[in-house]
Amino acid sequence: TRGVGAKVGETRGISWGEDVFTIPHFLVYTCSERGEAARNAMSPDITDLLGNDVRKPTALVHFERDMPLTEQKVMTLIIFHCQVADKDESGFYHIRKSFVRRFLGWDDSHNYPRIYEAFEKIFDNTIRWNLLGKDKTFKSLKCKLIVSLLEPTDTGPFIGFKLHPDLEPAIKDPRLFARIKLIMMAILAKPKYAFPLYEILSDCYSRGERVARLSLQELKESLGIAGPYYDQFIAFKKEVLRPNLAAINQNTDCQVAYD
């Protein structure tokens, strides 16, 4: 299908092709040791996880995306890590920095200060969740994703953090969620909105919606596009929708069209 002109407030449809996703085995890890050995167990090896999905709660897919893309991806990794790993006796999760680096597609970079900076920004930001009210099992609220962050000098190759208690139950055992392939974080590094759009559309598909109907304003808000930018659909289609859907169609196992 082909898009035509539209203004903010009008609803557009985005549809999915057949056989979009296969669901790989979901790995579950437990640990009971202490010290660095325990943190190693709490941070599963990346080679075991490359094909995995994160069960990202719908309410945590639709949020105010004001932070940079790196921080958004790290948030998804935090959610996944907390689903497959245990916290320590003090309630902290320990995620390996190299795990984050690899999934961000930074294989040739050892910019670990930037990774910790991403955690700091996430820690410093209060976020509005369930932005569009799609998750009826989850109350809409504003809170941080992580509420405590250990200093990097105390954690070595790991980053230690605590989840917000209002979000942790939904993260550990989500009732309504999107299945998002972790490897797509690196594959959909560009264009800017490819991975956020992939998350949003994956959520629609996971909930059985083969056609996602969103107004232009809703889609802009979901992607974190603020202000009057792209208020006309023609500009939005040219600069945002067309290049980002092309990246999704070319690099993932899904085919998406818009109307």
Describe the residue ranges of each PLM region:
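Charged, alpha-helix-forming regions
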Residues: 5, 9-259
